[in-house]
A protein has these predicted regions:
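Short, surface-exposed "cap/lid" segments of acyl-processing enzymes
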Residues: 33-76
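Alpha/beta-hydrolase fold nucleophile elbow
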Residues: 115-127
Length: 291
């Protein structure tokens, strides 16, 4: 796998004061020197960064990017605006979900444009990234299919905490840490080694309050989900955010094909589960079936 880090200037798309950059890593299969046929555009969740898809603190068996490049697919992983190494606009209150989605869409556009030809794009978002991939697909329809992992349009289950408690802990504006201790039971199954959990938590990112507030707002992307007109895959683990996974596909009423996959023996962070390869295989098969 060949990996290239980049800082993508999305100033014009974001429309904020000062320059605005999205940090990204492009993972390509070994030996790929030309335009890829298939690209996965991957957005991490709240409190995370793009290393979720290729964690430097774990062996390669935990690398989503490594596994998918071995299948011949390119992976573009970004840090969401305001998170990881991407710009942290000030005041944070100048951000909105629409601005963040526009910045992400521009980052994807720039990378695809460099190849000078058509590329089949799968947009994929995990958790809060699922919310953002829905928003992006609705407002900037440049993806051929959308995979929503661990995001619930139903009222969310949040481990040992709840929506009301997290809402009460939000500050008016700024960048905040995700309370990880109450999330452990939601994020990790019993088979995930403690050392891996602690390393994952040590690499956490802060999150813009704007995104945290949106993610805790019931129905925040219901209208956007209903407007997506490409194939959609909904993925929930047996321990995850939706109280009724079977109801999740119904929110994507304009999609020509909606599929639900349940990841067995896994919690919310599927990439750390012992069943992760089965999950990746099912996801890869769906991409190929809908290409």
């Amino acid at each position: 796998m060949k990996s290239s880090d980049m800082m993508l200037d999305v100033t014009s798309a974001a429309g904020l004061t000062g320059q605005t950059f999205i940090a990204a890593t492009l993972h390509l299969p070994d030996g790929m020197d030309e335009r890829p046929a298939q690209l996965i555009f991957a957005i991490h969740g709240g409190g995370y960064s793009r290393i979720y898809w290729h964690p430097p603190f774990a062996d390669d068996s935990y690398s989503f990017a490594r596994w998918f490049t071995d299948q011949g697919k390119a992976v573009l992983a970004i840090d969401m605006l305001g998170m990881g190494e991407s710009s942290r606009p000030e005041p944070e209150s100048s951000l909105s979900g629409a601005i963040i989605a526009a910045a992400h869409a521009e980052a994807l556009r720039q990378v695809v444009a460099q190849w000078g030809g058509p590329v089949d794009v799968t947009g994929l978002g995990h958790s809060m990234g699922g919310m953002m991939i829905i928003a992006q697909a609705a407002s900037h329809p440049a993806m051929d299919r959308v995979a929503v992992l661990g995001w619930a349009n139903e009222p969310m289950i949040l481990g040992d905490t709840d929506v009301a408690s997290l809402q009460a802990g939000l500050i008016p504006s700024g960048y905040i840490a995700t309370p990880r201790a109450p999330m452990r039971r939601l994020f990790y199954g019993d088979d995930v080694p403690l050392a891996l959990i602690e390393a994952d938590e040590a690499h956490a990112s802060t999150t813009p309050v704007t995104m945290g507030r949106d993610a805790l707002t019931p129905g925040i992307v219901h209208q956007a989900a209903a407007s997506i007109a490409v194939p959609v895959l909904v993925v929930q683990s047996v321990i995850d955010t939706s109280p009724a996974p079977e109801k999740e596909p119904g929110y994507f009423s304009a999609s020509p094909a909606v599929e639900l996959q349940i990841v067995e023996a896994a919690a919310h962070c599927q990439n750390f589960a012992g069943t992760r390869v089965k999950h990746w295989t099912q996801l890869n098969d769906w991409i190929d079936r809908t290409s």
